[in-house]
């Protein structure tokens, strides 16, 4: 584990292994570098693998209550400074939104981009369909639960939305409690993604190829975001991981890793 200084202040924790062209992995909004543990073990030799890890204890980039994707992109810039060259950036879920933002605002920092079901909710604001209604409903019910102090119910619905009914209840109790403690510390971060400056116009400005990965069992939200990406990116590659839902770095790591390696420039 290494701590790196982040431009503008603070630090970011990374886990790294190997040598060669740098490949940087960004985790989901409720996860950590552990989401990439199996991918690291399966990745062929010849790359410098770097996973950005989560903040703990309520800390995080930027100012609490006023965080933006720029703060999370700052973590990527810290890694680029650390490795001394442009990186292949792979972002999952929240990390995918950060990767898209970085590609639009700092293309010189990147050698390539891959996004795995990025939660770029701002792309759905102009879409008149069930996907935006679904994610707004999930957000609003989550906030109602949290205001009432019902964190279990808030994340039971959230986790089940992305993993299937009954998923959260099947977690071991100790894992659930540790997860909820961590999420209480992180707080309400919905607006970071809903208000992100990721639009059809910013996507069209991205000149580099972007590898868009989705699961065959993607939610209506992730499928709609993927459609917006493929419609607006100038140079998009598209892969579908058969049988996978949103949490494919954990559930379908082998096929996902093969897909990512195969499309890496």
List each language-model region with its residue ranges.
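Conserved serine/cysteine hydrolase catalytic core
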Residues: 178-231, 240
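Catalytic histidine-centered segment of alpha/beta-hydrolase-like enzymes
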Residues: 241-257
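Conserved hydrolase catalytic core segment
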Residues: 86-126
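Conserved HGGG/HGGXW glycine-rich cap/lid loop of the alpha/beta-hydrolase fold
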Residues: 7-62, 85
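Helix-rich cap/lid subdomain of alpha/beta-hydrolase
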Residues: 122-174, 190
């Amino acid at each position: 584990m290494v701590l790196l200084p982040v431009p503008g202040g603070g630090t970011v924790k990374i886990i790294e292994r190997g040598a060669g062209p740098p490949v940087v992995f960004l985790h989901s909004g409720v996860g950590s570098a552990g989401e990439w543990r199996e991918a690291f073990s399966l990745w062929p030799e010849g790359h410098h693998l770097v996973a950005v890890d989560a903040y703990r204890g309520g800390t995080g980039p930027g100012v609490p209550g006023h965080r933006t994707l720029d703060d999370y992109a700052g973590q990527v810039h810290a890694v680029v400074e650390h490795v001394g060259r442009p990186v292949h950036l792979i972002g999952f879920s929240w990390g995918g939104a950060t990767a898209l933002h970085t590609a639009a605002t700092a293309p010189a920092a990147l050698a390539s981009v891959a996004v795995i079901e990025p939660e770029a909710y701002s792309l759905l604001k102009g879409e008149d369909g069930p996907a935006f209604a679904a994610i707004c409903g999930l957000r609003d019910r989550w906030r109602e639960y949290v205001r009432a102090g019902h964190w279990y119910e808030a994340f039971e619905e959230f986790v089940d939305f992305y993993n299937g009914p009954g998923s959260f209840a099947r977690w071991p109790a100790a894992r659930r409690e540790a997860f909820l403690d961590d999420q209480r510390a992180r707080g309400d971060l919905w607006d970071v993604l809903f208000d992100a400056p990721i639009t059809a116009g910013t996507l069209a400005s991205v000149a580099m190829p972007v590898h868009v990965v989705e699961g065959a069992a993607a939610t209506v939200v992730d499928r709609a975001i993927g459609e917006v990406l493929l419609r607006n990116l100038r140079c998009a590659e598209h892969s579908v991981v058969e049988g996978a839902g949103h949490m494919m770095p954990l559930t379908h790591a082998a096929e996902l890793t093969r897909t990512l390696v195969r499309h890496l420039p």
